[in-house]
Swiss-Prot record:
PANTHER family with a match to the protein in the record: METHYLTRANSFERASE (PTHR33603), RIBOSOMAL RNA LARGE SUBUNIT METHYLTRANSFERASE H (PTHR33603:SF1)
Species assigned in the record: Rhizobium etli (strain CIAT 652)
Catalysed reaction, written as an equation: pseudouridine(1915) in 23S rRNA + S-adenosyl-L-methionine = N(3)-methylpseudouridine(1915) in 23S rRNA + S-adenosyl-L-homocysteine + H(+)
Lineage: Bacteria, Pseudomonadati, Pseudomonadota, Alphaproteobacteria, Hyphomicrobiales
Localization per record: Cytoplasm
Main location, first listed in the record: cytoplasm
Protein name per Swiss-Prot or TrEMBL: Ribosomal RNA large subunit methyltransferase H
InterPro entries: Alpha/beta_knot_MTases (IPR029028), RlmH-like (IPR003742), tRNA_m1G_MTases_N (IPR029026)
Class of the enzyme per the UniProt entry, highest EC level: transferase
Family named by the database record: Belongs to the RNA methyltransferase RlmH family.
Gene Ontology molecular function: rRNA (pseudouridine-N3-)-methyltransferase activity
Amino acid sequence: MRVGLFAVGRLKSGPEKDLAARYFDRFAKAGPAVGLELARIAETAESRASNAETRKREEAAILLKSLAEGSVLILLDERGKALDSEAFANLLGAYRDQGKRDLMIAIGGADGLDPALYDRADVTLCLGKMTWPHQLVRTLIAEQLYRAVTILSGHPYHRV
């Protein structure tokens, strides 16, 4: 299953980008052994519209246009469902085992996500109740993707 990340806003050079890249690289190298492949990391600039609702709508339109037909869409939102790492790994494994070809994880802009995305999403997850800066969200989800691969493969990286 091809796994991608869609993010509103561009990650600038620096330690956050380097760390996210390190975990995405680990995921890309280890994932194929368990049927997961890093498809792409797509960034789009934040909308310059004058109000939040229009910005969210424009950002959602870009994401929805980029989704392959039949893709699984996972939204990251602080109001989403919290999963532990094993449950997240099992979720990815379940979509893979159902024969899903593409899965996209989406990080919204500073204004949040448009209702059209919630309507289209298969799952909305959170990385905890706290609000995180987008730079850290990318790093956290990259690490969790790598961790999911290690859980699915029985690698000792994940210890409980």
